[in-house]
Amino acid sequence: MKEKSKNAARTRREKENSEFYELAKLLPLPSAITSQLDKASIIRLTTSYLKMRVVFPEGLGEAWGHSSWTSPLDNVGRELGSHLLQTLDGFIFVVAPDGKIMYISETASVHLGLSQVELTGNSIYEYIHPADHDEMTAVLTAHQPYHSHFVQEYEIERSFFLRMKCVLAKRNAGLTCGGYKVIHCSGYLKIRQYSLDMSPFDGCYQNVGLVAVGHSLPPSAVTEIKLHSNMFMFRASLDMKLIFLDSRVAELTGYEPQDLIEKTLYHHVHGCDTFHLRCAHHLLLVKGQVTTKYYRFLAKHGGWVWVQSYATIVHNSRSSRPHCIVSVNYVLTDTEYKGLQLSLDQISASKPAFSYTSSSTPTMTDNRKGAKSRLSSSKSKSRTSPYPQYSGFHTERSESDHDSQWGGSPLTDTASPQLLDPADRPGSQHDASCAYRQFSDRSSLCYGFALDHSRLVEERHFHTQACEGGRCEAGRYFLGTPQAGREPWWGSRAALPLTKASPESREAYENSMPHIASVHRIHGRGHWDEDSVVSSPDPGSASESGDRYRTEQYQSSPHEPSKIETLIRATQQMIKEEENRLQLRKAPSDQLASINGAGKKHSLCFANYQQPPPTGEICHGSALANTSPCDHIQQREGKMLSPHENDYDNSPTALSRISSPNSDRISKSSLILAKDYLHSDISSHQTAGDHPTVSPNCFGSHRQYLDKHAYTLTGYALEHLYDSETIRNYSLGCNGSHFDVTSHLRMQPDPAQGHKGTSVIITNGS
């Protein structure tokens, strides 16, 4: 009975051994290795192999245990893979999320002295430095994926340095510190996603494992490394201050060794790469060896070269303390962007030749020359800006206004529309409308504030062949809804520049094109309607009561076609008529009265000033037409007006109908509003006979509203908006309402760019 049990146990062990032997033969290992394996190693390797099939389900051949016919090409592929591993100067390894090594190539024994069988199936934490355990855990940790759940599989790149155990002899191990060798690992973390059947838009992801290649860094004995033509070596202190440089640095970077000694490496590295270099420097001090990322080393004559460095800390042989840093640097490219100076140590070349500049790409200098040539050939054309700008906030003057036949506003910027040449005018050759360069859609000019969609659809204005676009657009531009039972009082200011001549000279006002600088509105007896006045200069802003617009009060302004060919002539005639009126207005200051009816004196609009330009932009001109002050007081304060005198079909006065009257025709009641944009002192603009403390305040109690609600509008050239014949016809159709044109002074805020200019205030008095 005892003998029988012994035989049964022996048979069982033999069967078990035979099964393990058959299992070992199925492993993708040479038979010489599998025949020497024990049972524990066979189980460890088998489990690792099964895990590998999960990572690479199609990369390990046929199904488990199935023998397949191998073609000669398959044998060539295996041999090629073996040769690639030998020439890789490294080893390949695959690590599971728990740290188990699922696979490692046999070349690991060359770098670490540890066999493939010994490492496979064991935890990688057993073979790395304890200080690197946390880093390895972070590498193997996968964060919440940001990819779409429809993506089944993706990779996350990983690059890190590990100190792995090395059991090689010192003569073959290279640099080791405490039995550990620095290995540069680079690879990717493989993530696989699965969708749930019950929730197709939700899913889960699986961290399959890490696939990486380990490279052994150059040994510390740098004298054994052959320096090729694209390599140079330097020795530096622990803070990267250069101590010694190879003479090849002069051929590769242009710097002589003595130019770089006693300077840190950071001093000659591109500013965008200093962070990566700092991280590599930190790893070097911690682990002893490092491979930097590609960084840009500045060349002496401008530009840079791309460099990658292999740095090693050399220890003192006696004290075993870190002594210095030795780095082998590989210059990967020629000098790029020659002539581009990024450091004071660089010497700019006599003729900068950027590598990215081609014959078809103009340089900045060529662009400037081309702009100057275009400016000299056509002074009347404006240089447009890619972004919409507003003349009320940009005080620079357009280059096209310096010598333009129309002059221009002192506040005209490069984006303000100017009169185009006939060849460049949009539409037909007879179309003299303004070119709205900064606006793609003209409807945004007509309806610049909050309107109902029905208003935009039902009463959208369409330009006809005989319609001047500039007149239509300016005439339909409004700032609010006139309220019933109150007197709408519309006004517009247009700035005219002063030429280099004296303000009193007649030539100072020749050929000047007015531009509307701002549009404002007053309702009632000198009271501002805050619900309808736009307070923000932003082009997309609207008043707070934008939802209270009543579309029935807004009808299209009456329009009568005029002769386009006589627009410029009419404008010049208007300016000449204005000059005649200005000559009549040159009277003693006692003939002027304040708007409030008090006996305050007002500074003359055109006087010789001997003081420097003011610091703020001032719009003065609180003047009356040639009517008595009592008439104005009766009309505005006494309310001696017909209740329907200003009710012109409850529609705002079209700016396209506003024009200067003849010199013999004076407005019956026009109150001119003045606005101090920057609250400048008015005393500097007074003559000797005026009181120094008097300021032309119009409705002083409401001056805060003037400062708050002034809205700046650019882009409407008045020569497109009227001719004298049209205004006469329109004024007769508006119950005999008259129009008045007066002038006031306009100063430039910037002393460097300051130049005097006049502006025309056009008001519709009622």
From Swiss-Prot:
What segments bear the compositional bias annotation Basic and acidic residues? 394-404
Task: Extract the SUPFAM superfamilies matched here.
Answer: HLH, helix-loop-helix DNA-binding domain, PYP-like sensor domain (PAS domain)
Per UniProt, the short sequence motif Nuclear localization signal occupies residue numbers: 368-387
Task: For the region Disordered, give the residue spans.
Answer: 353-431, 528-563
Residue limits of the bHLH domain? 1-53
* Matches recorded under CDD domains: bHLH-PAS_SIM1 (cd19738), PAS (cd00130)
Q: Which PROSITE patterns does the annotation name? A: BHLH (PS50888), PAS (PS50112), SIM_C (PS51302)
Q: Which residues form the PAC domain?
A: 292-335
- The biased composition feature labelled Low complexity covers 373-385
**Location of this chain's protein in the cell:** Nucleus
Arranged from A to Z, the UniProt key words for this protein are: Developmental protein, Differentiation, DNA-binding, Neurogenesis, Nucleus, Repeat, Transcription, Transcription regulation
Q: Where is the Single-minded C-terminal domain?
A: 336-766
Read off the SMART domains from this record.
Answer: HLH, PAC, PAS
Q: Where is the PAS domain?
A: 77-147, 218-288
GO terms for CC?
A: nucleus
Predominantly, its location class is nucleus
Q: Some GO term, biological process aspect, for this entry: which one? A: nervous system development
Feature: compositional bias, Polar residues:
353-365
Q: Does the keyword Ligase apply?
A: no
Citing just one GO molecular function, the answer is:
RNA polymerase II transcription regulatory region sequence-specific DNA binding
What InterPro entries does the record tag this protein with? bHLH_dom (IPR011598), HLH_DNA-bd_sf (IPR036638), PAC (IPR001610), PAS (IPR000014), PAS-like_dom_sf (IPR035965), PAS_fold (IPR013767), PAS_fold_3 (IPR013655), SIM_C (IPR010578)
Q: Whom does it interact with, and what assembly results?
A: Efficient DNA binding requires dimerization with another bHLH protein. Heterodimer; forms a heterodimer with ARNT, ARNT2.
PANTHER family xref list: HYPOXIA-INDUCIBLE FACTOR 1 ALPHA, SINGLE-MINDED HOMOLOG 1
Q: What's this chain's function?
A: Transcriptional factor that may have pleiotropic effects during embryogenesis and in the adult.
Report what the protein is called: Single-minded homolog 1
